[in-house]
Amino acid sequence: MTAAQRERAALVATMSEIGPDSPTLCEGWTTRDLAAHLVVRERRLDAAPGIAIPLLAGYTDKVQRRTAASTDWDELVDKISSGPPLLSPFKLFDAVANMDEMFIHHEDVRRAQPGWEPRSLDAETIAALRRPVGMMARLTMGKVPARVTLQTPEGETVAVVGSGPGLTVTGDIGELTLFVAGRDEARLTFSDAQAAQAVRAARRGL
């Protein structure tokens, strides 16, 4: 199994354990809503573009709500577990397109629960998450009012984005991934608390 496939399996296990009505970090979404989002993304090519294109978002939201309401919970989870259908572009590019998606949404489920702790990630998962961080950071934080350096606790610079006063954000790769994706529930240290607040307010979520 690839790192993306293992993360998918872990997400499915967590969703199965906590059920369809638990909160997530995605504002207004329960685990059922999040599961429907993942199913629509991979299986409804007519509706998936609205996830990224605001002009089409209304139709996507309608399809997602219908999917959440009309599909049995176990069926939703099974569809996530089985992965993209044969003709889906996500099937061909699963390792690239789904690693971050599965990790971020798994943590959206985990970290909405009280008492969460970061998971210990294996080397393959860390490497798979590390590759797209820079591209994601440019997408979500390119216009933040600070020159942000993302670095690991070992001092490795992962990405530098934005312009303005310097801000160093330090954390493990998984935590940096979540921060870049717009999540505040991440274990990080910031060199400047005021700049960090401004960056949080200005970044785009995924």
PLM feature segments, named:
Residues 55-71:
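C-terminal end-helix/capping segment
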Residues 3, 18, 44-59, 75, ...:
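Structured surface interface patches that mediate subunit assembly and partner/cofactor docking
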Residues 4-13, 68-80:
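Short, charged, amphipathic alpha-helices and their helix-cap/turn boundaries
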Residues 1-50:
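An N-terminal domain-cap segment
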Residues 3-7, 26-30, 65-68, 93-97, ...:
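Short, contiguous, pocket-lining structural segments
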